């Protein structure tokens, strides 16, 4: 049996992973040309280390979120689990060896016991989430939203109980900070973790059952799959992976601040999973795609930091939101799940000036401190976006959308 080379090439190029690699290359090349400091050219090593390090930290708990999404769930509590785990880890260190903690010399066995205790707390959180969903019958969104709020409150109360009404726990160094600076070692550990999850999700019965449950839970139940146990496994994997990140963050930063630590990280994890090809409806997604989604997201954020400069971190949430919207749009249009025109209704036409105005305002926010910036640039950019969207709406109104993002067809004339 021979394989048509053209068909094989189309199949390879249509994969999410290849598309992400191409998109990542485009972002890197664009950053090289737009970065006024030419950081990628002057300091390629340090820049690559920073991006890889941030990708690894995001990747650990994003992979856990991906498993949950593939199984048909959602987890809004991963950021709170990170904060709680850092708090539990630091509290165990302080309670087990108070003298060593004050002196800044924690014994190895104390660290090991604290790590095990923290990971067990992650198992408990995953079990709680699974019970709220399977036992109580709450939707995953509501169940994990409740634990997200509750865990941060619990972490604040735990710190006050352990420290005597302080709001954070500080520790100079656990001896791991230098190891965490070795990006190669950290990346290898992450790839091993990702490889294990890839094997489980793609080469085992459990992984196939998780995909099947995410695709159609009722059909999975009728086929004899124990969906409740699978949900427990998925949420435990998600919570334990977040607990690992909480331990690493405390070891790296030397401080547990549940009020601010990892706030909003759950959205980044979901964003990376969606960018990597995971469908929020469940049943679709890969571990390699999620890894590349993390790399792409962190590269985009790093590119914005370099191009915009001072204060770019303020716009990180906006960038993540835009990237997620584009990723989901391309995914749904490319798969043919949605063929409705973007601007085929009155609401769509009304949104065109809104998007043009937002584009102009975003231009002002990003580039207002640049020497070349004038208000005329922002107005022209907003008008350009407005013209492009209006043209797109006009094409849709004349032809109608068949499928895909820009694939159109002419509607046949109606018979009177």
Model region roles, listed by residue range:
Residues 99-148, 195, 292-297:
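Alpha-helical transmembrane segments within multi-pass membrane transporters and channels
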Residues 31-34, 44-101, 131-138, 270-288, ...:
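Single transmembrane alpha-helix segments in multi-pass membrane proteins
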Residues 4-56, 208, 247, 251-259, ...:
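Helix-loop-helix hairpins and the membrane-proximal interhelical loops
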Residues 217-221, 225-237, 288:
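Amphipathic cytosolic juxtamembrane alpha-helices at the membrane-cytosol interface
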Residues 1-29, 195, 222-229, 300-416:
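Cytosolic-side transmembrane-helix boundaries in multi-pass membrane proteins
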